[in-house]
């Protein structure tokens, strides 16, 4: 019934009324850096790619990176509660930890566990680039499902400052600021910071009578300097900490702190472009009960990460580009690491990886071909070789077809190996074909994909503990995205159909077979309005070898809305309502999702 209502609503909009061309699809001036690790026009990227701009993030009033990502075609989000609680981001049905997560091109994934999508403050984000499909031949381990790159810097050097204050349901409060200053010598300084706190709500099912809150603080500073027309450099520091309340036989606390320092030097000549980048991260994760307290936390993990990159791209001639580069990464778990009050089995362990890659991009008239090969020397799993090949043919100015093929791998995490030291690395073979067509009234993109995964790591519910195992799996799907305008309203409509199962024929948990999205964005005079509809089909709650009705999450339809009113060119007031129809639902078994929530925000720029 819910899907029928959506179809009726869509049909009502497709009456012949003053259509505009769907301008948002892939604008010619949009530039991305993730697809080949250097800037290139989005129109020249073969892989399925979505770019979310700062303007879109602000207008939709996204409170977290999860709010940004759940609007992206092909992405499904699952969360164990509300703001700040653990979450998974599934790209085309792949595991959340099979996504390579970058901030300004630097890897954030840690072998100590999963990715925290909650800890990147949206206030410092300039744009988010999502590349779907294997990225192992350029980036190495973890990029099986794709790459998410959060960009916090901008090529624009315009000056300005922004201050925003917000409040909402569950006693949520937030404040953020940012300022950018451009200097006559070619330098650009950016400073930002903010805090957020909420009392939360009772996330457990059955309910415990307790609220589980969240609080965080963040600071960010960057400075870039153009030395001349060819050489430039930059340095940045990013810090955040957070405290999350969660349930584990009573109220428990998860504390995280992250410090990241990055510096790079870039050369951009008429033919050669090069980047030398270094990054150091210090990560601390604590888990403790009320009785233990923070100073006596039972689980303590401190991780030191070092990343070095040397990237090069050379234009041989018009339409022929080659790339080459090397990455070195080292990760060390502290000698005093604890797990549930006992010394961690992998305390003091370190792992390092050295990767080298070659790539090429050929433009042969209407035919474009890209390819890359990479070798990663892992100190535990020896050498892994990956490759990718992509091609696109421009049939006419408005119609094109594409195909991509590639391999990728992911090494087990520290947590995986602690619970099963015999685990093997995951390996995947991915295939995709696609079509993009621009018509008078709309633009459509269709992608069909087929992925085979060997040694997929799945955590199963055991007694008394969960445990990981290697299984083989296949993930197939069809992704259809349409763009069109009615008057001043821009529409994005997404339909996703997935077939995902392990070698025993069992569905993979938390992934629906069907997902639908309808995004409506409008700007009229002083108003910005956004309306989002998402439908998520039935799915398993936890991995099981046999079907169990108690293990199924029912389908759900959700509406979110936001509106902004510009009081003056410098002052805007915004309001947002999540879960307009107040649906009661879960995206993780035994964890309640938020009911209807209200937020308001006042932003002043000067």
UniProtKB/Swiss-Prot annotation:
Motif stretch (TonB box): 29-36
Membrane topology, record value: Multi-pass membrane protein
BP GO terms, sorted: monoatomic ion transport
UniProt xrefs under SUPFAM superfamilies: Porins
Top-level lineage group: Bacteria
GO cellular component, one term: cell outer membrane
Single GO MF annotation: ABC-type vitamin B12 transporter activity
Residue span(s) of domain TBDR beta-barrel: 158-606
Main location group: membrane
Subcellular location: Cell outer membrane
Motif TonB C-terminal box: positions: 589-606
Cross-referenced Gene3D superfamilies: TonB-dependent receptor, beta-barrel domain, TonB-dependent receptor, plug domain
Record-stated family: Belongs to the TonB-dependent receptor family. BtuB (TC 1.B.14.3.1) subfamily.
The protein's name: Vitamin B12 transporter BtuB
Lineage: Bacteria, Pseudomonadati, Pseudomonadota, Gammaproteobacteria, Vibrionales
Gene that produces this protein: btuB
């Amino acid at each position: 019934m819910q899907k029928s209502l959506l179809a009726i609503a869509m049909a009502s909009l497709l009456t012949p009324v003053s259509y505009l061309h769907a301008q948002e699809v892939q604008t010619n001036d949009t530039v991305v850096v993730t697809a080949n690790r250097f800037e290139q026009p989005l129109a020249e990227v073969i892989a399925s790619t979505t770019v979310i701009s700062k303007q879109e993030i602000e207008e939709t009033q996204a409170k977290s990176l999860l709010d940004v990502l759940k609007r992206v075609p092909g992405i499904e989000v699952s969360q164990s509660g509300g703001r700040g609680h653990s979450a998974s981001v599934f790209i085309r049905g792949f595991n959340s930890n099979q996504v390579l997560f970058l901030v300004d091109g630097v890897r954030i994934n840690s072998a100590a566990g999963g990715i925290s999508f909650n800890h990147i403050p949206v206030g410092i984000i300039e744009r988010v680039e999502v590349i779907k499909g294997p990225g192992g031949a350029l980036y190495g381990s973890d990029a099986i499902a794709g790459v998410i790159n959060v960009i916090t810097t901008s090529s624009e050097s315009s000056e300005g400052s922004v201050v925003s204050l917000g409040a909402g349901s569950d006693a949520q409060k937030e404040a953020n600021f940012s300022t950018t200053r451009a200097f006559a010598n070619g330098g650009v300084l950016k400073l930002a910071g903010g805090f957020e706190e909420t009392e939360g709500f009772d996330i457990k099912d059955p309910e415990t009578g307790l609220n589980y809150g969240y609080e965080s603080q963040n600071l960010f500073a960057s400075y870039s300097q153009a030395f001349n027309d060819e050489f430039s450099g930059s340095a940045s520091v990013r810090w955040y900490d957070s405290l999350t309340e969660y349930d584990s036989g009573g109220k428990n606390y998860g504390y995280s702190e992250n410090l990241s320092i990055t510096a790079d030097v870039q050369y951009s000549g008429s033919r050669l472009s090069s980047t030398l980048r270094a990054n150091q991260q210090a990560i601390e994760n604590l888990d403790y009960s009320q009785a233990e307290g923070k100073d006596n936390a039972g689980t303590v993990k401190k991780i030191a990460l070092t990343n070095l990159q040397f990237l090069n791209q050379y234009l041989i001639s018009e339409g022929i580009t080659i790339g080459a580069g090397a990455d070195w990464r080292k990760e060390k778990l502290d000698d005093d690491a604890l797990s549930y009050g006992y010394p961690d089995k992998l305390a003091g362990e370190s792992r390092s990886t050295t990767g080298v890659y070659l790539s090429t991009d050929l433009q042969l008239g209407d035919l474009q071909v890209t390819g890359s090969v990479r070798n990663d020397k892992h100190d535990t799993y020896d050498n892994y070789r990956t490759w990718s090949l992509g091609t696109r043919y421009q049939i006419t100015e408005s119609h094109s077809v594409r195909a991509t093929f590639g391999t990728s791998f992911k090494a087990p995490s520290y947590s995986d190996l602690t619970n099963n030291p015999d685990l093997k690395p995951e390996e995947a073979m991915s295939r995709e074909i696609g079509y993009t067509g621009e018509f008078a009234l709309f633009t459509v993109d269709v992608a069909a994909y087929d992925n085979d995964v060997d040694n997929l790591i799945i955590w199963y519910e055991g007694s008394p503990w969960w445990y990981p195992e290697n299984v083989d799996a296949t993930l197939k799907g069809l992704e259809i995205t349409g763009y069109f305008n009615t008057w001043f309203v821009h529409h994005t409509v997404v339909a996703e159909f997935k077939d995902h199962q392990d070698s025993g024929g069992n569905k993979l948990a938390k992934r629906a077979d069907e997902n639908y999205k309808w995004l409506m964005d409008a700007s009229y005079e002083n108003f910005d309005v956004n309306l989002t509809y998402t439908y998520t089909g039935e799915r398993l709650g936890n991995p099981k070898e046999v079907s169990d009705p108690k293990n199924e999450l029912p389908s759900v339809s959700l509406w979110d809305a936001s509106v902004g009113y510009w009081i003056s060119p410098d002052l805007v007031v915004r309001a947002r309502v999540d879960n307009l129809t107040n649906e009661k639902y879960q995206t993780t078994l035994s964890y309640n999702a938020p009911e209807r929530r209200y937020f308001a925000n006042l932003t002043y720029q000067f």
